[in-house]
Regions:
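Predominantly soluble domains enriched in secretory-pathway, periplasmic, or organellar proteins
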Residues: 1-311
Length: 311
């Protein structure tokens, strides 16, 4: 058995971001007013960690079989605009737009003990155990950036910068490969373009693919049942070794304008839908054959997902 956590961003400038907790098909807890834009969540040991972007907070909750123990612990990030995170060796590394860095939170003391400066606005962050890999999504002037930076954890320094094409967004470690979803815009933001890149983390070789006009992708990238999926045309579709989207394997067919987020575990795929950015919204849960299993009713703009296995 497991608990499923879904973070709902809420509306920018208000504090109605929330976290919904489900066991099986049932909602067992809804934590309202977590803050202003609940950006990302992750499970580490018996804790759920949430980044609240526009409240500039990290919230840490103890997980029990009954859900999250309240009120949890709050850590201020000092107006940094925190975004995404990864845990390595009991330290939380999280990206920040305003301060253009990766801050390091000690998960024993809850003290932010250091920061690693990067060049641009960092978004997704993953770890291979020895190095952090960080997607630089935008330059300081909000134009599309083009790099992924490899940072040695021990020395806290950038050891290599990989050019991967415009708008790197989400990262996914898949054995020796790092997948990069990309989204970028023309100069006046009237057109959106999509691509996928892949870094061979052993050889350093980079593959880059741009998708043609008319493909509607999102940035979400995850692995389920041995395949890497990306949001595509109102659902999710697998990517092949040449980085092409395989439309025949698509799961879900929702209005592509309303598909807000997607994620997956080994057996389940979550598709978060909003039509008006107001609560209630819906997460559709599919199995990896593509069949719809059930629907979760959640708060405004479901954005991220995490699972805790009940021991």
């Amino acid at each position: 058995q497991s608990l499923i956590f879904i973070s709902n961003e809420g509306n920018f400038g208000s504090s109605n971001g929330s976290i919904s907790v489900f066991q099986g098909k049932s909602k067992i807890q809804e934590i309202k007013n977590v803050g202003d834009v609940v950006q990302s969540i992750l499970v580490h040991d018996e804790k759920l960690i949430a980044i609240v972007n526009n409240s500039h907070l990290i919230k840490i909750y103890q997980i029990t079989k009954q859900g999250l123990r309240l009120p949890g612990i709050k850590v201020s990030t000092q107006n940094s605009s925190p975004r995404e995170m990864v845990v390595q060796d009991n330290k939380l590394y999280f990206t920040n737009h305003n301060t253009q860095d990766i801050k390091i939170l000690n998960l024993t003391t809850y003290f932010i003990e250091d920061a690693i400066k990067v060049d641009g606005l960092p978004e997704s962050i993953v770890s291979d155990g020895k190095n952090l890999w960080v997607a630089i999504n935008m330059n300081e002037d909000w134009s599309s950036a083009t790099s992924v930076q490899k940072i040695n954890i021990a020395s806290k320094t950038i050891i290599k910068t990989f050019e991967v094409g415009k708008g790197p967004q989400q990262l996914l470690v898949d054995e020796d490969f790092l997948w990069v979803s990309r989204t970028y815009y023309n100069d006046n933001f009237t057109k959106t373009f999509f691509g996928t890149s892949q870094i061979n983390m052993i050889t350093g070789e980079v593959k880059i693919l741009e998708y043609g006009k008319g493909s509607v992708c999102g940035g979400d990238l995850f692995k389920t049942d041995g395949l890497v999926y990306r949001t595509y045309n109102g659902g999710v579709a697998p990517l092949n070794a040449e980085l092409m989207i395989e439309p025949l394997g698509k799961i879900g067919s929702y209005n592509s304008n309303n598909l807000y987020s997607a994620n997956g575990t080994e057996e389940k795929i979550f598709l978060g839908i909003t039509s008006d950015y107001q609560e209630p919204d819906t997460v559709f849960v599919h199995n990896n054959f593509g069949e719809l299993e059930h629907e979760y009713i959640v708060g405004a703009s479901p954005g991220d997902y995490a699972v805790w296995t009940i021991n």
